[in-house]
């Protein structure tokens, strides 16, 4: 597979799940006429790679090829602070102009689908893997080999067809405003079923499944825990307590500290970020009856204008 310098973006901010760039050796082909020809071609490619490395390194060649293309454009579905830092760091490291547009995972999927093989961006960076899997099924992502994929914790942190690789992991749970709960004389919810109690009516926020991959994961989690029919009944009951469905998955977490939201459902790392911003009135809760986690991914969009 062709090596892609665009993947270096993931390298700059990978959190131990994977890094990117490079390719793995292919398995030995069977001895047929076609296989012999393929082996010869592979040998020639290997020689070309060796020449490149001898001339200053394979990565150096990729960097120069990418610089010649002028810029890198990113659709980002992680938090904007993280996305901005990744792009700035990439630009600083490699001297390649990098620009981004922050969109939810569902928005990126819709946009790339509409662009039909001629995407406005080159890389999709961050956001839960479910929409990435949909994009794989629709043929919207470019397969690539990541040389550092051998460092993955497990195979569940990458696409089986190598169309995306994980760059972080997030645990699903609740974030509550302890001051507001105390003012209302309420205990914090401990389980998913607790969220349907009448005492929490109008106090809960979660993201919209039409726009946020986070909400889709919440739905999938309940289906796995309860079965489809019981899960649908659960969401009917939960809906009675929902004050607002936000556009983005991190939206509810941002409203907990200021008191606009008493109980938020989402990824706990979003709550940690708010605590680091000074909101020490936020408590993080891992549901006692079980939960799930996301794998935040990165991928190259098929038909990217800057493939190197």
Question: What are these model-derived regions, one by one?
Answer:
Residues 190-199, 296-308:
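Bilobed periplasmic-binding protein/Venus flytrap-like ligand-binding cleft at the lobe interface
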Residues 252-253, 269-273, 289-292:
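Short, catalytically relevant binding-site loops at active-site mouths
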Residues 37, 56-67, 71-97, 174, ...:
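Short, polar/charged alpha-helical segment
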Residues 73-87, 99-115, 119-260:
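Extracytoplasmic ligand-binding site segments that recognize negatively charged/polar headgroups
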Residues 1-69:
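Short, low-complexity disordered leader/linker segments with a strong preference
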Residues 170, 234-239, 245-246, 278-304:
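Periplasmic-binding protein-like
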Residues 65-67, 166, 214, 290-293:
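Short, flexible turn/loop "capping" segments at secondary-structure junctions
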